[in-house]
Amino acid sequence: VSRQIIGKYEAATRVPQRDKAAAMDEALATGDALTLLWEQIMDDAHVPPEFRNALMMERRSKHIREYHAILVPGLLQTPDYAITLVRARRVNGPPESIDQVVQTRVERLQKLSDMRPLLWFVVEWVALTRVVGDEKIMREQRRHLIDLMEGGTIQLQVIEDSRHNPGLCGAYRVMSLHDGRTVGFVEDPLGGRSVTKREEIDYLSTLFGMLQSEALSPRSTLERLKELDHA
């Protein structure tokens, strides 16, 4: 690879082929770091820009804590649940772009399986009961959550009584990374923003602990999900 081409790679004005990334890994003795980065960039090509950084941090996490007030968190969504939401928000998007966004969303959990981070979620009761799409989609979504909990993939807690809980805010997550850093991501109607200030991270972490204290235990949450499943 010429010096000029490498300069274009470094300036992000040209994307290398996968074999070039692998060759640079070998030349620089970087293991497969550049190849993995290439795969992440290509996988994320259809992800809205405001979510790309959060997605990269997600893949470097050893512990993810997430709260959602009205929806099932994206990491846990079934394809039908996800496509219903994406279609509702991307009304002007071509069908192929919607399919790509949905595929990226539902593959997120699978891409974390090798690293096995601790995944802990707190959601409001309405996230499990409000109908997204139709009743069949919701039954399949709740069954998916049951399978993830019984398989030990996630810990999930539900807040049944929302009158006095400290949440009632937008969705957010706190991610503890393998390099020792902790970062956050707060969602809003335009996408969201990353959080890196220590005092803001501390606030989000404390708030998550307060939400956990108001929620049912994971075991009780699983029992409530099964009751809904058989209702």
Residue map of PLM features:
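Basic, Lys/Arg-rich alpha-helical nucleic-acid-recognition elements, primarily the DNA-binding modules
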Residues: 1-42
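A short alpha-helix capping/helix-coil boundary motif
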Residues: 1-2, 50-51, 122-125
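Short, flexible segments with low predicted structural confidence
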Residues: 5-6, 46-47, 57, 116-117
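Acidic-residue sensor for enzyme active/binding pockets
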Residues: 10, 58, 187
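Short alpha-helix boundary/capping motifs
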Residues: 23-25, 34-37, 52-53, 62, ...
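Short, leucine/isoleucine-rich alpha-helical interaction segments at C-terminal helix-coil junctions
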Residues: 31, 37, 41-44, 211, ...
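Short, charged recognition helix plus adjacent turn
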Residues: 35-67, 169
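Hydrophobic protein-protein interaction segments
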Residues: 63, 67-231
